[in-house]
Amino acid sequence: MHYTSWDRSDRTKPVLLAEDGPEQLGVFSENSAEVDGHFWRTEVSDLGASATLADGSIYRLAGRPGRDKRLEASLNGRTFTFINENSGDWIIDDVDDEKVGQFTARNSGVRKAILEFEHDAEGLTTAEIAGLSWFTGVILDANTQGKAWVWIITLVLASIVALVALFVL
């Protein structure tokens, strides 16, 4: 598999696809997922994200997804690092600093959250591919939400200044 992407036609239950589909790797909701026929309990907070798999394995993303430029991921003891190279471009390195994959927020990167793998994801299980892909979506969503708040506050302040200028001057 060269990459994963998301089908977000149902916003409450995005579907993780192998490449552009039709093969589905998993279906995610706010607090759970079904990946490769197995239940996952998922949680996202300001300090990271975690998924507890049916067999008790834990996948964890440590750091502030909307702010940090470097996040550490542990997939049941297997370590990966998400590194923001510049603005919206990210890479994923393994413990040996070998590039595993990359993704971007540019173009339709946030909507599809495409995670491209090096060497066709060789050496990664379906669960690990799904975990890294889910963390990619968490990071992109957190960055989008942070930028949305900046725009909202800017527009509110600009509106107040415009109203003051209109009625006072």
Regions from the language model: what does each represent?
Residues W134-L169:
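C-terminal single-pass membrane-anchor helix
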